[in-house]
From Swiss-Prot:
This is Cytochrome c oxidase subunit 2. The gene is mt:CoII. It comes from Drosophila simulans. One of its GO terms (molecular function) is cytochrome-c oxidase activity. Mg(2+) binds at residue 198. One of its GO terms (biological process) is ATP synthesis coupled electron transport.
C-alpha cells in the first residue's frame, strides 16, 4: 500500500508491475537527458553572443533535430509496445476470480471449485480495530494464492467502476453489461490494497479492495473450509 511520504510508486508484488516500474524509470531517464540537453543549449544561447554569428544555413543541425527525436521516440515506443502486449496476454490461469462493482461495494465469485460468493464492504471508521487502515480495510478480504496465475473478470451491476490494485499493476474497468478480463501473478505473500478508480457516485471513495496473498496450501484449506 502507499505509505506516508511515499513520493514514488508502490513496491511491486507482480512481474508486470516490476516491468511497469522499469519502463517508468527508462522513460524518466530519457526525459532527464532531454531536459539537461535543452537546458545546456538555452544557457549557451543566453550567455554566448557569437555562437551563431556566421550561421547562414543549417542543414546538418536540421538533420540532427529531425533524426534524433525519431530515434528517441523509438527507444520509448518499443518497450512501451512490448509492455502493452504483455499486459493484455492471458496465460493459463490457475484461479479465476469474478469481481462485480456495486454502489458502493464489491462482490466476488470463485467458480473454479464450487460457487463461493461474498460481498466486500468497507469497515466504517467507528468499527475499525486499532491496527486497521481508515477507508482501506474491508470486512471480507479476497484470498488468492501466491506464485499462481490469476485471471480476474470484472463487471458492474449499476454504473462504471474500476477494479484497481496498484501493487499488482492491475486496473480494469467494470462496465454494466460487459465482462472485462486481465491476469496477474502475485510473487509474494501479504496484504495489497486498492480502491475503485472510476468516479461512481457519492460514496466512490468508500469501496476499497483488499487482497490477501497466501501460500497455495493455505488457499486450498480456505477453499475447503468454505466448501464445507
Amino acid at each position: 500500500m502507499s505509505t506516508w511520504a511515499n513520493l514514488g510508486l508502490q513496491d511491486s508484488a507482480s512481474p508486470l508491475m516490476e516491468q511497469l516500474i522499469f519502463f517508468h524509470d527508462h522513460a524518466l531517464l530519457i526525459l532527464v537527458m532531454i531536459t539537461v540537453l535543452v537546458g545546456y543549449l538555452m544557457f549557451m544561447l543566453f550567455f554566448n553572443n557569437y555562437v551563431n554569428r556566421f550561421l547562414l544555413h543549417g542543414q546538418l543541425i536540421e538533420m540532427i533535430w529531425t533524426i534524433l527525436p525519431a530515434i528517441i521516440l523509438l527507444f520509448i515506443a518499443l518497450p512501451s509496445l512490448r509492455l502493452l502486449y504483455l499486459l493484455d496476454e492471458i496465460n493459463e490461469p490457475s484461479v479465476t476470480l469474478k469481481s462485480i462493482g456495486h454502489q458502493w461495494y464489491w462482490s466476488y465469485e470463485y467458480s473454479d471449485f464450487n460457487n463461493i460468493e461474498f460481498d466486500s464492504y468497507m469497515i466504517p471508521t467507528n468499527e475499525l480495530t486499532t491496527d486497521g487502515f481508515r477507508l482501506l480495510d474491508v470486512d471480507n478480504r479476497v484470498i488468492l494464492p501466491m506464485n499462481s496465475q490469476i485471471r480476474i473478470l470484472v463487471t458492474a451491476a449499476d454504473v462504471i467502476h474500476s477494479w484497481t490494485v496498484p501493487a499488482l499493476g492491475v486496473k480494469v474497468d467494470g462496465t454494466p453489461g460487459r465482462l472485462n478480463q486481465t491476469n496477474f501473478f502475485i510473487n509474494r505473500p501479504g496484504l495489497f490494497y486498492g480502491q475503485c478508480s472510476e468516479i461512481c457516485g457519492a460514496n466512490h471513495s468508500f469501496m476499497p479492495i483488499v487482497i490477501e496473498s497466501v501460500p497455495v496450501n493455505h488457499f486450498i484449506k480456505w477453499i475447503s473450509s468454505n466448501n464445507s
